[in-house]
Regions:
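Generic low-complexity segments that are intrinsically disordered, proline-rich and/or Lys/Arg-biased
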Residues: 5-6, 108, 265
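Bacterial N-terminal signal peptides
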Residues: 6-16
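Cyclophilin-like peptidyl-prolyl cis-trans isomerases
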Residues: 19-209, 233-234, 370-371
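A structural boundary signal for the start of the first folded domain, especially the loop/turn
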Residues: 178-281, 289-371
Length: 371
């Protein structure tokens, strides 16, 4: 006999949704998720990303956008469950971030070091830059490719084993836990949210990729069913918004020699000059027919790229090898997920190579040079 969803959730509550003295948490702000499969707890990064956390806490506690006298986050279900990827919720009874019932929108908050690199990261769903509202997701594995596209604002510290057990349409509740004076003092009221919103750094990058933008795929080498080039451009523009550092990338079907650049290396250097990033930026160029990358690093960023003063070509070759390995891993995961009846296309393989290169470059250039 199958129990109604409400009884299953009640059973989970009675089984121990409240933390005991033995499970005492360190000072901080937390969200306790009670599901039919068990309880998991996420630490909220309220000091690093206060706007995002204020929205989440306000919607959970009812201080922002209450619905019918109850917190907005009442009656939630996990309406998107992708095994090995994410579980998603946040819009009661709805499944689309484009719906008019979203209580508010606010800009992204990207902080170096907050990454989708492991299971249990709590992050905002969106429909593009600065379209955060109420929907959030929790990662079910390494989702590094989501970095600088979605704002990470929490990390699961207890109950990781619960996450892969979540089923579509499982009901759940959220309880905010405040431990310590700083967490107790953190406000999520309309005035605080409005002040944080006014101080937010807005997206100023291009809406579409093009000749002068951070990313471009002029010949449409990458898949177009989902706008991959557009999303890669958002990612690199967001990285610059967060760090001040410019990383550009270009994808071409093949290299075409010119009088000025008879081989890919000088072509990449000349392109960096024409884009205005020759001295202070990074340019990665991919030629699909060779499945090969060429990277230019400006002198201003060379201490970050090569902090140990090795031969620059050795460092680049190590990067290229790491990209190959990471792209191969992405490819194998995709093949396994698709199965033999839905083989990968050349455009997909190019996409995984771009994922790998950008993941590694963003990780490298988040860091500071050695003193």
């Amino acid at each position: 006999m199958r129990l109604p969803q409400t009884l299953v959730l009640l059973a989970a509550l009675l089984a121990g949704s409240t933390l005991t003295a033995e499970e005492k948490l360190a000072d901080g702000l937390y969200a306790e998720f009670t599901t039919p499969r068990g309880v998991f707890v996420t630490e909220l990064f309220y000091q690093q990303v206060p706007l995002t956390v204020a929205s989440f806490v306000g919607l959970a506690e009812g201080t922002l956008a209450p619905r019918d006298g109850k917190p907005f986050y009442t009656g939630l279900t996990w309406y998107r469950v992708v095994p090995g990827f994410v579980i998603q919720s946040g819009n009661p009874g709805l499944k689309d971030t484009g719906d008019d019932s979203i209580p508010h929108k606010f800009p992204d908050e990207f902080v170096s070091g907050l990454r989708h690199a492991e299971t249990g990261m709590l992050s905002m769903a969106n429909a593009g830059p600065d379209t955060n509202g109420c929907e959030f997701f929790v990662t079910l594995g390494d989702c590094t490719r989501l970095n600088y596209l979605h704002s990470v604002f929490g990390r699961t510290i207890r109950g990781l084993e619960v996450l892969p057990q979540i089923k579509p349409d499982d009901a759940f509740s959220i309880k905010i836990l405040r431990v310590g004076a700083a967490a107790q003092a953190f406000k999520a009221d309309p005035a605080t949210f409005a002040a944080l919103l006014a101080a937010g750094v807005k997206y100023s990058g291009a809406a579409e990729p093009g000749p002068a933008t951070a990313f471009d795929d002029p010949a449409k080498v990458l898949p177009t069913e989902v706008p991959r080039a557009k999303n890669f451009n958002y990612k690199l523009a967001n990285f610059q918004r967060a760090t001040g550092r410019q990383i550009f990338a270009r994808v071409y079907p093949a290299f075409t020699p010119t009088e000025e650049a008879k081989t890919p290396a000088p072509f990449t250097q000349q392109l960096a000059k024409s884009l205005g990033i020759h001295q202070s930026g990074v340019l990665a160029v991919y030629f699909a027919d060779q499945d090969r990358w060429y990277v230019w690093v400006g002198d201003d960023l060379m201490p970050v790229f090569n902090p140990d003063h090795q031969k620059t070509m050795d460092v680049k070759n190590a990067l290229y090898a790491a990209v190959k390995a990471k792209a191969a891993a992405y490819t194998e995961l995709a093949r396994a997920a698709r199965g033999p009846d839905n083989p990968l296309k050349p455009a997909d393989l190019a996409k995984y190579s771009v994922d790998a290169m950008l993941d590694l470059l963003l990780f490298q250039f988040e860091s500071k040079p050695k003193s």
